[in-house]
Amino acid sequence: MNHFLKYSFSFFCLLACSACNDDGIDILDIEIPEGYALSAGTSTIFLNSSVAYDTPADWITGAYDVRFTRGDRLYDDVRTSNNGHGGGLGPVYAGYSCGSCHRNAGRTKPSLWTEGGSGSYGFSSMLVYISRKNGAFFQDYGRVLHDQAIYGVQPEGKLSVEYTYETFSFPDGEAYTLCKPNYTISEWYAEEIKPEDLFCTVRIPLRHVGMGQMMALDPVEIEALAAKSNYPEYGISGRCNYITERGVRSLGLSGNKAQHADLTVELGFSSDMGVTNSRYPEEICEGQIQVNQGSMMGLSYDQLDVSTEEMENVDLYMQSLGVPARRNVNDPQVIKGCLLYTSPSP
């Protein structure tokens, strides 16, 4: 990972490279203007295709390339509800593979937009977080509402959304429209939760490309950058998020609002797909009626659904994805946007 650290600061700075729109350009062929850096140093790749996010960095060779391919396969393979290899889906879940929500290591269009809520084809490319208004969890439910389930098992609930559209104007008079989502959860498997008692957050999938570079950064460097990110005139104060996992206090690096110290691929398999592993060996619906319903449908809970080696391969796959270079950097409109982005506000 040391070759990542050399370029770590560039991940937090203005990133650019000279124009290159043709696939297959080698990093040594690129002239980097003074004061700029490639998006991910030696992990920068030059692809504009639909698989640009799902391509290994050029330094992935030999045994690492084999493991990358295996991890990629596990990431994309559809899990089934059988008890053999590739099984373990459910009893409740949100998606049936990592790739169902993170297509080509990017984002799948959420069923929130395509179907107005929970998906009707066995997966919902979104996560529905539920809690009490004070942040506590509800009895009979966890932090995520699992709105999908295998055949014969009852989902925890179903989400629907309606949008309210409002029109506003910029100072120069140009109009724009914002839509406000209004969420409703129905078909609760246990006691119905009243809307006035419920805090619901719906999150669309994250892109996974570039996370390897975040993992490679020196925590001291991140803390130093956060210390500089204070803008009292705007009411902004940058700070790191520290978390405690398994009794160890660490700097949060991944997940929504940096709630995890690593890529937590095991949590994704467990919470999103119901696939048990050595880090999360219990079913995500442990203690709920869905466990018994799953048993009646033939599920066995006597073994882990994926091995530690398989999880390590998925982790390596995500850590070593190449990061596409910025495109169209010499386009006049892009240059204007870059200047606006980096200029102090009036």
Regions found by a protein language model. Give the residues of each.
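Bacterial Sec-dependent N-terminal signal peptides
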Residues: M1-T42
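Extracytoplasmic redox metalloprotein regions
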Residues: F46-L47, Y53-R67, D77-M311, D315
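Extended, hydrophobic/aromatic-rich amphipathic alpha-helical segments that build helical scaffolds
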Residues: F68-V78, S100, V334-L340
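A glycine-rich, coil/turn loop motif that links secondary-structure elements
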Residues: G88-V92, N330-I335, L339
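His/Cys-centered metal/cofactor-coordination and adjacent catalytic loops
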Residues: D315-N330
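Conserved small/polar residues in nucleotide/adenosyl-binding loops
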Residues: Y341-P346
